[in-house]
Amino acid sequence: MSCDLHIHSTCSDGAVPIERLASIAARTGLHAIALSDHDTLLSAQYAYAHTGQDEVELIPAVELTGYDFERQHRVHLLCYYPDVDCPALREHCAIMKERRNACALQSAKELEQLYPQFTTDLAWETTKASGVLFKSGLMQALELLGLTDGSIYGETY
């Protein structure tokens, strides 16, 4: 049985809408995938509701962001079959959503200054599924505007 236990969708910083992941997994020969988006329960809820889509087992998961105080850096913890109604888990996801959006909005403001054709609204359009603006959404908006010729990433980020 082949599986991928760490897949992201457009519910976080992935490039593929969650509805398409099972069919892509089936075409590549996978029997199961864990939908493990960053700090959101949307993908776990989807997996619980669509267990055997396209003959691929959807495993509910979430990738939680934390901090290792001993080593002083961020860590990620994969949590499988989370309780999507757990108040503490929901609160963690809400806090991370707020933090990510604040950080991304600051980056979006800087991009608007550098590239007048770039708008924060366009970046938000790329993240409708999650309501969280990830760096990948900013990059996708830049790509839609033809601003990713290879040099922007190294210079701006």
Features from the language model and the residues they span:
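An N-terminally biased module of ancient metal coordination in phosphate/nucleic-acid-related enzymes
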Residues: 1-72
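Extended substrate/RNA-proximal surfaces in nucleic-acid metabolism proteins
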Residues: 53-157
